């Protein structure tokens, strides 16, 4: 976003009562960009995490840099968006299984980091709710710090989150009904 456009967006938001934003980081380029925005605008906050759709063979190298963002004078407000996405998998079962395994390993590594940082966590879960819950349970993170972003599951899954102390957020997807 060019500065004039960003300024206009911030002004329009302010005029209707929106006074702060959280930019959700999904890959290394986002983290750097959003941290810079957050440094320039006191009402813009950011998160850092590797989104499951960006998990590739080099995910370990990317993820190892995330905790360093918390050592910065302007740290993220949450770890995420992290999670599992089983929606767009290849038809080839072997390739599909490789992607799922990589996403699961990456999620577990990031949950361990988030637990060590004792920070809030934003979860991306698409066609993978049960696995996400299982890995969060296994990680031992505080469920009260977990929010399932862009929640698209049913009432039973929402009750499951609430039972554990987790939360769900609803975005434009709530209008799809």
Regions of interest found by a model, annotated:
Residues 1-177:
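Mid-domain alpha/beta scaffold segments of enzyme catalytic cores
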């Amino acid at each position: 976003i060019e500065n004039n456009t960003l300024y206009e967006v911030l002004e329009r938001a302010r005029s209707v009562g929106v006074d702060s934003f959280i930019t959700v980081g999904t890959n290394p380029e986002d983290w750097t960009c959003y941290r810079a925005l957050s440094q320039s605008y006191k009402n813009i906050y950011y998160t850092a995490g590797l989104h499951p759709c960006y998990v590739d063979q080099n995910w370990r190298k990317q993820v190892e840099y995330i905790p360093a963002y918390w050592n910065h004078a302007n740290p993220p407000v949450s770890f995420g968006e992290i999670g599992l996405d089983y929606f767009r998998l290849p038809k080839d079962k072997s390739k599909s299984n490789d992607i799922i395994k990589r996403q699961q390993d990456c999620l577990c590594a990031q949950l361990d980091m988030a637990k060590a940082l004792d920070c809030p966590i934003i979860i991306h879960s698409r066609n993978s709710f049960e696995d996400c819950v299982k890995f969060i349970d296994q990680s031992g993170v505080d469920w009260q710090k977990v929010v399932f972003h862009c929640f698209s599951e049913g009432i039973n899954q929402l009750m499951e989150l609430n039972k554990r102390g987790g939360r769900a957020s609803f975005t434009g997807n709530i209008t799809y009904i």
